[in-house]
């Protein structure tokens, strides 16, 4: 197994003193003949993103069936791991492959509110000033309101934060 490193784009923040963020656009470290300063941007090598590349000739990709995109990504990650990490992951993968084909990806369910719930939340949020911060004294009242219209406090808070720019 052979290990080398490659330096990619410059990550130096040139506007840090101003409290902002600005990079110079250098896409890859250009090795100078002497020293560690990049020929392209003049920054030290340590400012450039380092990628450790471990090449491993013993992995034969044709012996692995590609059952899903997830499996392909696992194999790509596996290519760059150490032998010990690779053995542990291969053991875990053999248990997952049979159930992996059966599982379907479930997306997070989006909350849907009725027109009455939206109108009630809009009126109550206007009464609160479109913020729930510093409303600890009203916490119980907010809980009762949410139970009354059939939404959780979390969903009400999220709805207020997402909609205050439209109604406030």
UniProtKB/Swiss-Prot annotation:
Domain of life: Eukaryota
Coiled coil: 76-103
Region span, Disordered: 82-112
MF annotations from Gene Ontology: DNA binding; protein homodimerization activity; transcription cis-regulatory region binding; zinc ion binding
Gene3D superfamilies: Homeodomain-like
Residues of the site described as Required for DNA-binding: 160
PROSITE patterns reported for this sequence: ZF_HD_DIMER
SUPFAM superfamilies cross-referenced by the UniProt entry: Homeodomain-like
UniProt-listed InterPro entries: Homeodomain-like_sf, Homeodomain_ZF_HD, ZF_HD_homeobox_Cys/His_dimer
Quaternary data: Homo- and heterodimer with other ZFHD proteins. Interacts with ZHD11.
Purpose of the protein: Putative transcription factor.
Name of this protein: Zinc-finger homeodomain protein 14
Origin species: Arabidopsis thaliana (Mouse-ear cress)
